[in-house]
Amino acid sequence: MGRLAKGDDLLQALENFCQEHNITLGEVRALGAVTRARVGFYNQEERKYYFLDLEQPLEILALVGNISLKDGKPMVHAHVTLADAAGRAFGGHLAPGTPVFACEFAVHEYQADRTLARQDDPETGLMLWPPS
């Protein structure tokens, strides 16, 4: 649990926390506010992310994600729901380029006998966990 510094990139700061604390498997939640945001939507037919840049202050209504390994390092995969001053909600895949205004977070580390490493999934075009 903790608070991120104002100006930190939200996604990178969460990944840095996981790396610094050697957290390789778990989940993350957060709330707070950002000065602007970048969220993505994965077009399943094109197998391509499209990004929405929201150039305004926003409240983090919910951020939920998981932590696993990608290329041997902890990776945070998070989705976020944000609201503007008029109460409109926006959401999607959290992308780099989302500076923190204020953010409190909690990480729940899983103690497992193995780690999950992301791998290319040719069926979806995404980097996913292996099938269970």
List the predicted regions and their residue ranges:
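N-terminal intrinsically disordered, cationic/polar leader segments
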Residues: 1-76, 81-132
